[in-house]
Design a protein with these regions (language model features):
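Glycosyltransferase donor-sugar binding loop
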Residues: 45-46, 178, 205-222
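Conserved donor-binding/catalytic core segment of Leloir-type glycosyltransferases
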Residues: 8-10, 168-185, 190-198, 206-209
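Acidic donor-binding loop of glycosyltransferase active sites
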Residues: 250-265, 278
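Donor nucleotide-sugar binding/catalytic pocket of nucleotide-sugar-dependent glycosyltransferases
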Residues: 26, 55-58, 119-122, 129-164
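N-terminal subdomain of nucleotide-sugar transferases
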Residues: 1-46, 337
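Nucleotide-activated donor-binding/catalytic signature segment of Leloir-type glycosyltransferases, i.e.
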Residues: 221-242
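A charged, aromatic-enriched C-terminal amphipathic alpha-helix characteristic of glycosyltransferases
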Residues: 302-303, 313-348
């Protein structure tokens, strides 16, 4: 049990069935074992496991209703901060909520930490960096601020959900990407790079799984699909809508390569695919810093198609050996259990 008795958590949803944010509920369920009292102010309540020391308060956070959201959240949060007096606040991906109460937590001398793992240097992040006790992130390069207040503790992946698969029949034909269909994820780059690789390896097949995060990103996704008409007609490209997170292990197990074009923070899906035993073809520098890249030349590290070519040149024995090594790194640095341990150390 932590030396801190009462923790207040901000998150977007308490719903273990949410296709994107179910992990927020999972984190709460782990933290209740370490604190005498856990209170969560959340944006939406769904299905979650109840505990005698857990209280959940619904602020009814609705996307697009910014002013109303802020008022409802403050109406719930401020009286609780004054009367409930938690000893520490953990804000899980909720930079706006942290911003809204940052001055109050500062004046009330309540320790306040924000989980933030993005490259974007938003106004809210900069404000929170000034008034909060710390910013918690996955890797040093996954937060745009360099400061003693930044704590890198890895990603939080339940390794039991991603067992290492049998690689004896690995064919390196089916490529998959799972993630938001947003411009930052570089779907168009992924498609063009696979098209280049197909000139040497025509058996390659690509599946992109995910949905746009908002109406603006939907325009981008629709344009990508229209521009990919020839690839769709040729039968080597497939688009699929987002799936529940519970289906991710099965999808990863049914493919040969995870391909990824995001140049920012360390995506959790990269860790999940690594745990399963998929080779990761990516230009993400945060991933390469921890796991390396396929190919020794800088040019190869920055080219998805050249990484595919390098992968194809490896013997199965050498490939499997490297994939096992990468899984060991992922378990050591990014398991949910160790993430919780490191988080509690920071919060205390």
């Amino acid at each position: 049990m932590s030396k801190i008795d009462h923790i207040l958590i901000f998150n977007y949803c308490m719903d273990e069935n949410d296709p994107v944010l179910s992990q927020q509920t999972q984190v709460v369920s782990r933290l209740v074992d370490h604190y005498s009292k856990v209170t969560v102010i959340t944006g939406r309540v769904g299905q979650y496991q109840t505990h005698s020391n857990l209280t959940v308060i619904d602020s009814n956070w609705i996307v697009g209703k910014n002013f109303a959201n802020a008022l409802r959240f403050l109406y719930k949060a401020i009286p609780f901060l004054i009367r409930g007096r938690p000893q520490v606040i953990f804000s899980h991906m909720t930079e706006v909520q942290s911003f809204l109460v940052s001055l109050f937590s500062y004046l009330l001398n309540i320790k306040h930490f924000l989980w933030y793992a993005h490259k974007a240097k938003s106004f809210y992040l900069q404000w929170n960096h000034l008034l909060l006790d710390g910013i918690i992130t996955s890797t040093p390069g996954s937060c745009p601020i360099i400061s003693p207040k930044i704590h890198a503790i890895g990603q939080a992946v339940d390794i039991n959900q991603f067992p290492f698969r049998n690689l004896s029949n690995l064919k390196l034909k089916k490529l998959v990407h799972i993630g938001r269909f947003d411009k930052s994820k570089n779907a168009s780059l992924i498609i063009s790079e696979v098209e280049i690789a197909r000139k040497s390896f025509p058996e390659l097949f690509l599946t992109l799984i995910g949905a746009p995060s908002n109406s603006e990103e939907k325009k981008y996704s629709e344009a990508v699909i229209i521009n990919s008409n020839n690839a769709l007609l040729d039968g080597w490209l497939n688009f699929s809508s987002s799936v529940p997170r519970s289906e991710t292990p099965k999808i990863l197990d049914g493919n040969d390569i995870f391909i990824h074009g995001y140049q920012g923070s360390l995506d959790k899906t990269l860790i999940e695919a690594t745990l399963v035993g998929l080779p990761i073809v990516t230009i993400n520098l945060e991933y390469q810093a921890e796991f390396g890249a396929w190919g020794s030349e800088d040019e190869s590290r920055n080219s998805l198609s050249k990484q595919i070519k390098y992968l194809k040149s490896l013997t199965l024995e050498r490939l499997v050996s490297e994939l096992k090594t990468r899984r060991d790194i992922a378990v050591e640095k990014h398991s949910l259990e160790k993430w919780i341990e490191k988080l509690i150390v920071v919060l205390n």
